[in-house]
Regions:
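Short, small/acidic-rich helices and loops at N termini and domain boundaries
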Residues: 106-149
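Structural alpha-beta junctions
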Residues: 41-45, 85-98
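Short, charged, surface-exposed secondary-structure boundary motifs
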Residues: 53-61, 79-80, 104-116
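Acidic beta-strand-to-loop metal/phosphate-binding motif
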Residues: 24-26, 63-79, 98
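Phosphate-handling DNA/RNA-contact segment within nucleic-acid enzymes
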Residues: 1-66
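Acidic, metal-coordinating catalytic cores used for nucleic-acid/nucleotide bond scission
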Residues: 31, 51-55, 72-83
Length: 154
């Protein structure tokens, strides 16, 4: 066939406006980029199309001179951090967000949730408790010492 296949970011067409000053947020799945755009419009949301997708020299060229934040799925942060040297050579600024890893429960980490999963989810009592324990670590000692259990409303 007479064509050349070129991998690109999902949402890359949104970068054609040269006047945009929004930071670019990159996620793994197309669904996540769409959901995040709805909830967090301060960023231009792009998707790689997979954990390893679009992290090559040609594909990332569209990010030249841009401020970029990578928002990997739970469990993928180290893999995405390995892409920093490539991106740092092209982007004005790039960082990997730890917001999911820092706030997820062990169960959520095991499931490998992404930011869309959190944006679409209603906070459960277990999630609220984990958030409080993260903020106030002595709370866990108190819970353990007194044998407290989480009681959910019927």
């Amino acid at each position: 066939p007479d064509f050349t296949l070129r991998q690109c970011f999902f949402g890359e067409h949104l970068l054609t406006d040269k006047t945009t000053t929004k930071t670019i947020a990159i996620v793994e799945s197309e669904k996540t980029a769409i959901v995040a755009t709805h909830f967090i419009s301060d960023f231009v949301w792009l998707a790689t199309g997979g954990m390893n997708g679009c992290f090559n020299k040609d594909a990332v060229e569209v990010l030249r001179g841009k401020e970029v934040v990578l928002v990997p799925d739970l469990g993928a942060a180290d893999k995405w951090k390995s892409k920093l040297p490539l991106l740092q050579s092209i982007c004005k600024q790039v960082l990997v967000s730890n917001i999911l890893e820092d706030n997820a429960t062990d169960e959520q980490k095991t499931k490998g949730l992404d930011i869309a999963d959190f944006l679409l989810m209603t906070e459960t009592p277990q999630m609220a408790l984990q958030r409080l324990i993260k903020r106030h670590p002595p709370l866990q000692h108190l819970i353990d010492s007194l044998g407290l259990v989480l009681v959910e409303e019927p």
